[in-house]
């Protein structure tokens, strides 16, 4: 068996990635989220495949086909709610995974980090298009508002929006192409994940100290396979509690009303995982400025290696930057809350303050804190 594992051209790739992979001996539970994201992706692809067997991407029947899945298909209600809440679990794991990367300075593995940012954009695009498919009120108006943002691009904006819509408004052509893209993107994401892992295995994993761990490596199997399995059990437990007891808690009641172009919902808002970016978008009165801020809120992650001023990699032994980091986390929670609130006083000013704070902490305060910590170290 050992000979096959190490010699077979296909199995040896799996062996070098998941079995004999040298891993740091001290990586904590924060390193479990990679495998959990892999699990989420598998769940989403499988449930999505079964949903696609019964779904029809036509404006006249899309809403009814989702109702048919929930009422008439064997365990269709379970598949539908697993897919909808699976997206939420996916984003929870994604945010924690990125947050771990920022905290422990994993962004210094530049290729892996940039691939991760591409993956984040791909997953966000997939989730957005998936939200349009049930063709409820929030699906329709969310698609209208978000795609309409592209009209802020000078000269070609309006033409670009109509090209994406396939007409002069969000309609049958839009729904059909969104379904096609929503179906193909997860497979593209799977390919990108393999590239992400390829880059990761070039350098090896980071660890909680931020120090080089080449002198102290252990095999991935059985130590981290069993550890990942515990994470999988906890995730599945939380996932099934969410899906079976509170299936609609993260959804919007407006999406149980069929799409109606003549009736605008009182508050148009995206799913909870986009609310922080939506709050940043809304906090700038200018349309183009808002769109740029929205894009920059994610793209700014790519600049983190350039903004790293400290002599140490991780925040483990850096209390000043740690404080900045947790203020940033709190700020993101505030932005998420604001994104779901109506555009009125005092929410507007809170959103604007939180948006400025978000960029200021990343671009100004965290690099400054790093330099101050360097000076404190030099005093010794």
From Swiss-Prot:
<dbReference type="GO" id="GO:0006122">
    <property type="term" value="P:mitochondrial electron transport, ubiquinol to cytochrome c"/>
</dbReference>
<keyword id="KW-0408">Iron</keyword>
<dbReference type="InterPro" id="IPR030689">
    <property type="entry name" value="Cytochrome_b"/>
</dbReference>
<comment type="subunit">
    <text>The cytochrome bc1 complex contains 11 subunits: 3 respiratory subunits (MT-CYB, CYC1 and UQCRFS1), 2 core proteins (UQCRC1 and UQCRC2) and 6 low-molecular weight proteins (UQCRH/QCR6, UQCRB/QCR7, UQCRQ/QCR8, UQCR10/QCR9, UQCR11/QCR10 and a cleavage product of UQCRFS1). This cytochrome bc1 complex then forms a dimer.</text>
</comment>
<keyword id="KW-0349">Heme</keyword>
<feature type="transmembrane region" description="Helical">
    <location>
        <begin position="320"/>
        <end position="340"/>
    </location>
</feature>
<keyword id="KW-0479">Metal-binding</keyword>
<keyword id="KW-0999">Mitochondrion inner membrane</keyword>
<keyword id="KW-0249">Electron transport</keyword>
<feature type="transmembrane region" description="Helical">
    <location>
        <begin position="288"/>
        <end position="308"/>
    </location>
</feature>
<comment type="similarity">
    <text>Belongs to the cytochrome b family.</text>
</comment>
<dbReference type="GO" id="GO:0008121">
    <property type="term" value="F:ubiquinol-cytochrome-c reductase activity"/>
</dbReference>
<keyword id="KW-0830">Ubiquinone</keyword>
<dbReference type="Pfam" id="PF00032">
    <property type="entry name" value="Cytochrom_B_C"/>
</dbReference>
<feature type="binding site" description="axial binding residue">
    <location>
        <position position="83"/>
    </location>
    <ligand>
        <name>heme b b562</name>
    </ligand>
</feature>
<feature type="transmembrane region" description="Helical">
    <location>
        <begin position="226"/>
        <end position="246"/>
    </location>
</feature>
<feature type="transmembrane region" description="Helical">
    <location>
        <begin position="113"/>
        <end position="133"/>
    </location>
</feature>
<keyword id="KW-1133">Transmembrane helix</keyword>
<dbReference type="InterPro" id="IPR005797">
    <property type="entry name" value="Cyt_b/b6_N"/>
</dbReference>
<dbReference type="InterPro" id="IPR036150">
    <property type="entry name" value="Cyt_b/b6_C_sf"/>
</dbReference>
<dbReference type="InterPro" id="IPR027387">
    <property type="entry name" value="Cytb/b6-like_sf"/>
</dbReference>
<comment type="function">
    <text>Component of the ubiquinol-cytochrome c reductase complex (complex III or cytochrome b-c1 complex) that is part of the mitochondrial respiratory chain. The b-c1 complex mediates electron transfer from ubiquinol to cytochrome c. Contributes to the generation of a proton gradient across the mitochondrial membrane that is then used for ATP synthesis.</text>
</comment>
<dbReference type="GO" id="GO:0046872">
    <property type="term" value="F:metal ion binding"/>
</dbReference>
<dbReference type="GO" id="GO:0045275">
    <property type="term" value="C:respiratory chain complex III"/>
</dbReference>
<dbReference type="GO" id="GO:0005743">
    <property type="term" value="C:mitochondrial inner membrane"/>
</dbReference>
<feature type="binding site" description="axial binding residue">
    <location>
        <position position="97"/>
    </location>
    <ligand>
        <name>heme b b566</name>
    </ligand>
</feature>
<dbReference type="InterPro" id="IPR016174">
    <property type="entry name" value="Di-haem_cyt_TM"/>
</dbReference>
<dbReference type="InterPro" id="IPR005798">
    <property type="entry name" value="Cyt_b/b6_C"/>
</dbReference>
<feature type="binding site">
    <location>
        <position position="201"/>
    </location>
    <ligand>
        <name>a ubiquinone</name>
    </ligand>
</feature>
<keyword id="KW-0679">Respiratory chain</keyword>
<keyword id="KW-0496">Mitochondrion</keyword>
<keyword id="KW-0812">Transmembrane</keyword>
<keyword id="KW-0813">Transport</keyword>
<feature type="transmembrane region" description="Helical">
    <location>
        <begin position="347"/>
        <end position="367"/>
    </location>
</feature>
<keyword id="KW-0472">Membrane</keyword>
<dbReference type="Pfam" id="PF00033">
    <property type="entry name" value="Cytochrome_B"/>
</dbReference>
<feature type="binding site" description="axial binding residue">
    <location>
        <position position="196"/>
    </location>
    <ligand>
        <name>heme b b566</name>
    </ligand>
</feature>
<dbReference type="InterPro" id="IPR048260">
    <property type="entry name" value="Cytochrome_b_C_euk/bac"/>
</dbReference>
<feature type="binding site" description="axial binding residue">
    <location>
        <position position="182"/>
    </location>
    <ligand>
        <name>heme b b562</name>
    </ligand>
</feature>
<feature type="transmembrane region" description="Helical">
    <location>
        <begin position="33"/>
        <end position="53"/>
    </location>
</feature>
<dbReference type="InterPro" id="IPR048259">
    <property type="entry name" value="Cytochrome_b_N_euk/bac"/>
</dbReference>
<feature type="transmembrane region" description="Helical">
    <location>
        <begin position="77"/>
        <end position="98"/>
    </location>
</feature>
